[in-house]
Amino acid sequence: MRNDVHMGHKARKRFGQNFLNDPYIIDGIVSAINPRPGQNLVEIGPGLGAITEPVGREVDKFTVIELDRDLAERLRTHPELADKLTIHEGDAMRFDFTQLVKPNNKLRIFGNLPYNISTPLMFHLFEFHKDIQDMHFMLQKEVVNRLAAGPGSKAYGRLTVMAQYYCKVVPVLEVPPTAFVPPPKVDSAVVRLVPYETLPHPANNLQWLERVCREGFNQRRKTVRNCYKSLMSEQVLEELGVNPGMRPENLTLQQFVAMANWLDANHK
């Protein structure tokens, strides 16, 4: 039997499809999500319904976003799910999630994300952080490590800083390749992202925050002094509580934001 066919559907490489089929892992993910009736639940990329079906047993209504028209059609005719689902057929990367927001009922988003788009999709979702209660995603384990990393670690980078700017990051469980059909070439993991009600270190201009992150992490081996010499003096760095002799990978989120806010105030 071909290892890229599951439940009669051939996995499509261009959509980055790997179908989850391990009952133990599925139970662990659904327990982590803890779906309840009345919640504003949204699944990105339901695929063949491995998580969709058990979530559907817990709630009356929820929303799914599916790019693959064949899989969307399967869900429309699914004997258990058809009446419970609102199906949006399209690309989550271009989706306006504000259209799903209900009064006093923030979005709870979950999904087994295609690994080839997981990082840009998370950046897209961060734009809606005020409307999201939490997110649970299956991702490449390496990406989860980056999301949860601390300053000074090899995994610490731009994704870390931007994710932790918006969200509390909690790794939930690790998932081996054997849990999927076809098995991916990498280990996977589930992560919980909980957007802050109030940002702990708000930036006055996100473009400056993204720039100081980009310039710092693109030159990881340079000192802070050399990375940012065209933007701010050594004296300014010291006034901001930043050691000019350290490397950017050792800067905290708070320090990146302090630098971004100084640049916003002084580079008009």
UniProtKB/Swiss-Prot annotation:
Pfam (any one): RrnaAD
Coiled coil: none
Molecular-function GO term, any one: RNA binding
Keywords: Cytoplasm, Methyltransferase, RNA-binding, rRNA processing, S-adenosyl-L-methionine, Transferase
EC number(s) stated in the UniProt entry for this protein: 2.1.1.182
Superkingdom of this protein's organism: Bacteria
Gene3D superfamilies linked: Ribosomal RNA adenine dimethylase-like, domain 2, Vaccinia Virus protein VP39
Subcellular localization, as worded in the UniProt entry: Cytoplasm
Catalytic function, reaction form: adenosine(1518)/adenosine(1519) in 16S rRNA + 4 S-adenosyl-L-methionine = N(6)-dimethyladenosine(1518)/N(6)-dimethyladenosine(1519) in 16S rRNA + 4 S-adenosyl-L-homocysteine + 4 H(+)
This protein's encoding gene: rsmA
Function recorded in the entry: Specifically dimethylates two adjacent adenosines (A1518 and A1519) in the loop of a conserved hairpin near the 3'-end of 16S rRNA in the 30S particle. May play a critical role in biogenesis of 30S subunits.
NCBIfam families in UniProt: ksgA
Protein name as catalogued: Ribosomal RNA small subunit methyltransferase A
Family of this protein: Belongs to the class I-like SAM-binding methyltransferase superfamily. rRNA adenine N(6)-methyltransferase family. RsmA subfamily.
GO cellular component: cytosol
Main location per the UniProt record: cytoplasm
Residues reported in the UniProt entry to bind S-adenosyl-L-methionine: 18, 20, 45, 66, 91, 112
Species, as recorded: Vibrio vulnificus (strain YJ016)
